[in-house]
């Protein structure tokens, strides 16, 4: 527009040549297109990574304060009354209990470390249904064990496993415990840090492996309605929860997805700098 105004308003004999105007217009258009595409790609990539991290562990987790940063967790008591109280927060969309147990898969030719994550009927499986390649994501239980498991495509390929195979899993505590589980679903998120780690099964099974009471779990996952209110919601729940230990004296610890994955979110933050660099260079 500006280029055309300059061209039309120039005095006779001093008009800028039409090719120069066209080149300027095309250059500006290309620059804007490149800028929009670059920014869109970066923003979309950040959103995709964040959504996958949230898909594996929700926006906020409540666990045992004394638990180390590992998947061999100490339990906390989470009964129905606590679940109802957490669901009453305005920004909380969904609440679900989970338990984890590190172990190993062994086949005739190989073995692989993994984390068995137990979930129950309340688990929101939308994320895994979206990334399911084969089989099904069953409704797992907190009151019975079906000996079924959902595994990632990358782990299945590494161990040469397929849908319907039975796998031998081993867990070390005071002694070695073994469980044979049937693969009923295969998922793929292309987020290798988690794909190479997690198998999903019944909450009941994992609690039995951990020797826990029925209302003891590794923690609670909370999905919120507005990501922009993540920090605010985290501190609100923490203020109400941190000072109230369970019946065994275990203290609760509330952490959000950014606190649980600081390296990944710091890296995503660096991408914002790239956006500004692109904008400055294009201007």
Task: Tell me what each language-model feature is.
Residues 1-32:
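N-terminal Sec/SRP start-transfer signal
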Residues 75-76, 80-215:
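A structural signal for hydrophobic secondary-structure junctions
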């Amino acid at each position: 527009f500006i280029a055309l105004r300059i061209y039309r308003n120039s005095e006779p004999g001093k008009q800028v040549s039409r090719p120069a105007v066209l080149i300027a217009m095309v250059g500006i258009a290309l620059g804007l297109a490149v800028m929009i595409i670059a920014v869109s790609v970066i923003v979309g990539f950040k959103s995709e990574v964040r959504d996958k991290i949230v898909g594996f562990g929700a926006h906020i987790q409540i666990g045992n304060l004394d638990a180390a940063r590992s998947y061999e967790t100490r339990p906390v008591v989470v009964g129905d009354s606590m679940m109802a109280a957490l669901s009453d927060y305005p920004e909380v969309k969904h609440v679900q209990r989970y338990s984890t147990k590190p172990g190993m898969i062994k086949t005739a030719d190989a073995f692989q470390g993994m984390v068995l994550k137990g979930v129950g009927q309340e688990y929101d499986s939308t994320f895994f249904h979206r990334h399911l390649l084969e089989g099904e994501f069953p409704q797992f239980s907190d009151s019975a064990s079906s000996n079924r498991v959902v595994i990632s495509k990358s782990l299945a390929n590494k161990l040469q496993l397929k849908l319907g195979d039975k796998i031998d899993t081993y867990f070390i505590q005071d002694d070695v415990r073994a469980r044979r589980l049937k693969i009923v679903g295969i998922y793929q998120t292309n987020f290798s840090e988690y794909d190479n780690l997690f198998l999903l099964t019944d909450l009941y099974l994992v609690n039995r492996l951990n020797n826990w009471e029925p209302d003891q779990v590794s923690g609670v996952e909370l999905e919120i309605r507005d990501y922009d209110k993540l920090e605010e919601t985290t501190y609100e729940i923490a203020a109400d929860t941190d000072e109230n230990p369970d019946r065994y004296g275990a203290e609760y610890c509330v952490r959000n997805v950014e606190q649980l994955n600081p390296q990944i979110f710091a890296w995503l933050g660096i991408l914002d700098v790239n956006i500004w660099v692109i904008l400055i260079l294009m201007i």
